[in-house]
């Protein structure tokens, strides 16, 4: 079984490596999103160092990210699924918003064009393991590592 400290360290490491995109205030919108005066927001990249915020990425959510007033973090899990991912990408683009997409390795392998679209649109892409087993807490460490690494090490989109 995976100990909770392994899960916390793994999640913290992933957050550190990925950074997060944060939806900000409309004040900076004009410079970041020309031609969309009525768009909802803009984005900034927020890199979270787990040494400074060790609780980020844990299941308990006892600590939040260092956000400004009216900021939220948008994340989407378990894609890319062409039907839904394309709709979400259009909505985000229409409003000049960036997000983080945690994709499943098997979905990425089946839909590499979807991953390319996420990256080309400027979104952050992270892993949600190879096939998103719901039994991580009861899985032997070597199998969990294979799941995590399989989601990370798939073919790079070109």
Q: Each PLM stretch: what is its role?
A:
Residues 28-31:
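Boundary at the C-terminal end of the N-terminal hydrophobic targeting segment
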Residues 40-143, 147-154:
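Active-site beta->alpha N-cap acidic-glycine motif
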Residues 34-36:
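N-terminal module-boundary/linker segments of secreted carbohydrate-active enzymes
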Residues 2-15:
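Bacterial N-terminal signal peptides that target proteins for export
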Residues 12-24:
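Bacterial N-terminal signal peptides
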Residues 158:
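Active-site acidic/histidine proton-transfer and metal-coordination neighborhood
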């Amino acid at each position: 079984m995976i100990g909770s400290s392994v899960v916390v360290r793994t999640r913290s490491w992933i957050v550190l490596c990925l950074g997060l995109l944060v939806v900000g205030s409309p004040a900076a919108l004009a410079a970041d999103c020309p031609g969309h005066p009525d768009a909802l927001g803009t984005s900034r990249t927020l890199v979270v160092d787990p040494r400074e915020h060790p609780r980020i990425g844990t299941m308990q959510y006892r600590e939040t990210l260092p956000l400004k007033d009216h900021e939220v973090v948008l994340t989407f899990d378990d894609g890319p699924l062409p039907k839904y991912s394309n709709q979400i990408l259009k909505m985000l683009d229409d409003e000049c918003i960036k997000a983080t997409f945690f994709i499943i390795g098997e979905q990425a392998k089946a839909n590499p064009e979807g991953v390319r679209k996420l990256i080309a649109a400027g979104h952050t892409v992270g892993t949600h393991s190879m096939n998103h087993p719901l039994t991580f807490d009861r899985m032997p460490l070597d199998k969990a590592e294979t799941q995590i690494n399989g989601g990370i090490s798939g073919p790079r989109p070109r």
